[in-house]
């Protein structure tokens, strides 16, 4: 045999030795009362105009400014959800969703209607955008919310249950009672509060509260509200967009870098850290961030594996969830919550303070 043939044989034997074994990942977990439940909430945060215009964001042009294409997100979510009925996704910004909806065939629209009615795809917040809560007049907040909700009601015959103002800089009591409780939301979640307030709330487990925003309406217009422990991002090392560098969960023992034990350990420890600052045995992880899920399979493939192996390990229980499922789970515990009145204003961010200090002092 010549060198070429020998080499070829080695490659062939090498390929045959990498056993490929089909694994059916068990993603069917539901809430387990006696354990820490990690609610994995798959989401994207799509600013309706920020570094690019709303049109550029939708079609994915001018990607040198920011690599962001919202129609890719919505296009890729549909097959990813159809591939496993346990997977879930939330979508927020109606300015993008309605644009995409108008571009779809009747067949796709019917599939999406089924995903919404089965609860796999949940439309939350439901306004055209995630409005700022400090500068706009409340009439405009009502109008832009109404416009989005009307469409959702007409097309899907559902009403969004959850307020999801994860990126506005600080939060107003008006948002809590008028654009939250009075809209009919069951809960309201957000990412940005003053960094000192957040630190204190982590210490005394008061990130989640009952928020009574109106003095005159009192408890008749209160709402369950939660600030996230960090931002609206996943825990460290759990980012799975195509170019993200979080370590993948490599579960084929015949390949290099098998790491199931290590990655499960990291997952469990992040869950316990968050449980330590949270009332009840339910914690929510926001699995996504700005303009993510442009290729949704990369996220779901990893989350499928985590759910499978973390639950096999058994120290905590991981599940595909939504903020509605999380809210119902919190409610079912009968926990009593700290009371919050007035605003989450003024807002200061520690990162920004540091940058100001470095560049302007
Ligand atoms: C966006 O892309 C278009 C087409 O390539 C180009 O003409 C325009 O200058 C770009 N805009 C910005 C702000 O870079
Ligand atoms: C849990 O919280 C307590 C008090 O807030 C803190 O002292 C402790 O280090 C935390 N433990 C873990 C594992 O995060
Ligand atoms: C919560 O309270 C309801 C009504 O009193 C009761 O049926 C239920 O068992 C309680 N749940 C827990 C987890 O204590």
Predicted regions and their residues:
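Catalytic-domain carbohydrate-binding cleft regions of carbohydrate-active enzymes
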Residues: 18-361
């Amino acid at each position: 045999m010549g060198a070429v043939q020998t080499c070829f044989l080695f490659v062939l034997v090498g390929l045959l030795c990498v056993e490929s074994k089909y694994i059916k990942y068990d993603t069917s977990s539901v809430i387990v009362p006696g354990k820490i439940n990690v609610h994995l909430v798959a989401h994207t945060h799509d600013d309706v105009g920020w570094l690019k215009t709303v049109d550029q964001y939708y079609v994915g042009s001018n990607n040198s400014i920011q690599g962001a294409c919202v129609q890719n997100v919505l296009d890729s979510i549909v097959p990813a959800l159809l591939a496993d009925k346990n997977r879930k996704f939330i979508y927020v910004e109606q300015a993008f969703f309605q644009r995409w909806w108008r571009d779809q065939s009747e067949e796709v629209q019917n599939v999406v209607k089924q995903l919404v009615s089965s609860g796999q795809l949940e439309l939350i917040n439901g306004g055209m955008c995630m409005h700022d809560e400090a500068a706009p007049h409340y009439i405009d907040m009502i109008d832009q919310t109404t416009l989005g909700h009307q469409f959702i009601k007409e097309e899907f015959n559902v009403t969004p249950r959850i307020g999801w103002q994860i990126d506005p800089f600080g939060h107003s009591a008006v948002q809590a009672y008028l654009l939250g409780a009075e809209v009919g939301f069951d809960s309201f979640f957000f990412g940005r509060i003053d960094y000192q307030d957040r630190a204190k709330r982590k210490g005394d487990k008061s990130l989640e509260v009952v928020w009574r925003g109106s003095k005159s309406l009192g408890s008749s217009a209160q709402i369950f509200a939660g600030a996230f422990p960090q931002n609206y991002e996943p825990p460290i090392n759990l980012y799975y967009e195509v170019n993200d560098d979080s370590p993948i969960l490599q579960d084929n023992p015949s390949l290099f870098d098998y790491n199931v034990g290590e990655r499960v350990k990291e997952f469990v420890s992040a869950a316990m850290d968050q449980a330590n600052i949270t009332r009840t045995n339910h914690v929510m992880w926001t699995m996504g961030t700005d303009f993510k899920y442009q290729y949704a399979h990369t996220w779901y493939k990893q989350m499928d594996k985590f759910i499978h192996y973390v639950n096999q390990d058994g120290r905590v229980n991981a599940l595909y969830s939504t903020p509605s499922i999380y809210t119902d789970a919190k409610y079912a515990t009968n926990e009593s919550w700290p009371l919050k009145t007035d605003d989450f204003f003024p807002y200061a961010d520690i990162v920004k303070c540091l940058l100001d200090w470095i560049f302007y002092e």
